[in-house]
Amino acid sequence: MPIIDIHIHLSDIDSFHRTAIDLSKVDYSAAGLKAEFDKNDVILGIGMGVTEQTKGAFPDSSSPNPMGLDLEEKVPSFLMECVGINPNHLGGDHAQAELDRIEARLQAPEVAGIKLYAGYYHHYVYDKIYTPVYELAAKYNVPVVIHTGDTYSMNGLLKYAHPLTVDELAFQQRGVNFMICHLGDPWVMDAAEVVAKNPNVYADLSGLVVGDRPHFERFMNEPLFMDHFRRALVYSDHYEKMLFGTDWPLAPIDLYAEFVRRLVPEQHHEKVFYENAFDLFPRIKQRIEDLG
């Protein structure tokens, strides 16, 4: 079965480099990612754009818009990009210039969507500062991907990353599709309700375990941990709106795919691992066709 990994990273972020070395034990490079893709029948990935101007500064308030995948000079052919947004630069005298650069980037064929780092940046997703970004998403028919749940930085504020904030946003912006990252973990039941209630809200299952095989074995063999997520999936009962992602380099792709296969009932595997990505990200069809 072909797989589309809709949530990976390929940015020069210090914490990602350290995680790859110390925890997940992966080769954090385009070549390393491609090798894992080939080994696991992953035909396409979507990278979440993010940058830091100073080593260790993520989430960096000084990063210009849009934030991209800067570990390599250009986006590899087997990837697409969700352009990252720094809301701190969307106000003031230079806001229009920032928005103009975002819009120009959205016209690139390798761009699949927009990424908001809620919690990392201290703005609610329904804050008016993001309104022009949602207007661009509607104009170019791309989804907005939103970090929710625990932040991979002590400088994040969790109140901005709670999945219930997406409920108000989805109501305000019915013309835009949104994806809740990480199923809102640890607030997975809240995220499940937001997905079930709102026709324009999806969720990914990325980033729920970080580390190498011993980490995965520990958690996959803990019923309380697995049932934490299964309960939310069963409650939502919208497997057509759940998408596979790994959050690589936070975990090896083979281990993460095994984990999600255990979480999701087998009859829904093809939807979650492959088909649902086409529904949420309209541009991936052309990207895959271009790969031949």
How does the language model describe each region?
Residues S11-Y28, Q53-K55, T151-S153, R213-R218:
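Acidic/histidine-rich helix-loop elements
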Residues P109-G113, Y126-L243, L291:
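Catalytic pocket-lining loop regions of alpha/beta-barrel enzymes
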Residues S24-A57, F78-N86, A112-G113, A118-G119, ...:
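Divalent metal-dependent hydrolysis catalytic cores, especially in the metallo-beta-lactamase
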Residues H7, F37, G68, I114, ...:
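Conserved, mostly hydrophobic/aromatic
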Residues P59-Y160:
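Active-site gating/metal-coordination segments in enzymes
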Residues D27-F37, G91-R105, V188:
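Short, acidic/polar
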Residues H9, V50-T51, G84-N88, Y117-Y121, ...:
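Active-site beta-loop-alpha junctions enriched in small/polar residues
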Residues M1-S11, S15-L44, R231, Y235-L243, ...:
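Mid-to-C-terminal alpha-helical segments outside catalytic/metal-binding sites
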